[in-house]
Amino acid sequence: MADPACCWRSGEARRQSPGGLPNDAWRNTTHDWASAVDADHLAEVRRFPTVFAPGGTQHLILEVVAYAADEAETTTSGRCVVTLHADDSVSVSDNGRGTDTRCDDQGQPIKKPVMATKDLRFFDLSDAQLLPDGHPRRGMSVVAALSKWLIHTNRRRNGAWTQRYEQGLPVTDLVPIDDEGTSGTTVHFLSDASLCGPTAVTAAELGQRTVWPHLSVEVIDERTN
């Protein structure tokens, strides 16, 4: 696996995270650190797309923005840009802390498995938090599972990387990218129309739905001239 900057700067990384421990010893808060991919979970989501993403692409966008809202709540201020691209893909970029990335006891980079494992806070709960569309929040893995492809770009103080997924499964390692001195996450995805239906998202409706305390959301529609 290519080493992202967290392992290039091992001293800094270990000050910021419990380095030197096997990842199955790290405390789970939102996801299970011991599992990088839960293929059965992803397959379940793909079998029942209307259960886990009612409303299709719009619900997937809200699932992503909800994580930016989580970040904003911890700082009382955050910014997010949702871009509807001409190829019907969608990107969601925020200025939060970025996805937690650590080095294990072997010096290998490990990122919190937000894309390919269930969110322990929401997925199996009957009374999960409701998103602004009125449907339960299930987690980022639903977005990955129901997308033809998804690219997760992550920037933290200890380095930056990108990783590509197809049908929820990672198809690349963590690929280091230039550190711009900023932090935040970009999730760029193309929903699978065979599972979610055709993309039917308007910028106006999305602007009305992406309302969270402490988070400023800008919607850019590149599909129109």
Regions found by a protein language model. Give the residues of each.
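Flexible ATP-lid and adjacent glycine-rich G1/G2 motifs of the Bergerat
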Residues: 5, 44-51, 96-173
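A broad "non-catalytic interaction surface" signal
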Residues: 26-34, 111, 173-177
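ATP-lid-like helix-loop hinge signature
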Residues: 63-97, 101
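Bergerat-fold GHKL ATPase/HATPase_c domain
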Residues: 1-77, 104, 200-201, 225
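Short glycine-/polar-rich loops that comprise or flank the Walker A/P-loop
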Residues: 146-150, 182-185, 212-215
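Short hydrophobic alpha-helical segments used for membrane anchoring or interfacial signaling
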Residues: 83-85, 153-155, 219-222
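Glycine/threonine-rich ATP-lid/beta-loop region of ATP-binding domains
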Residues: 186-225
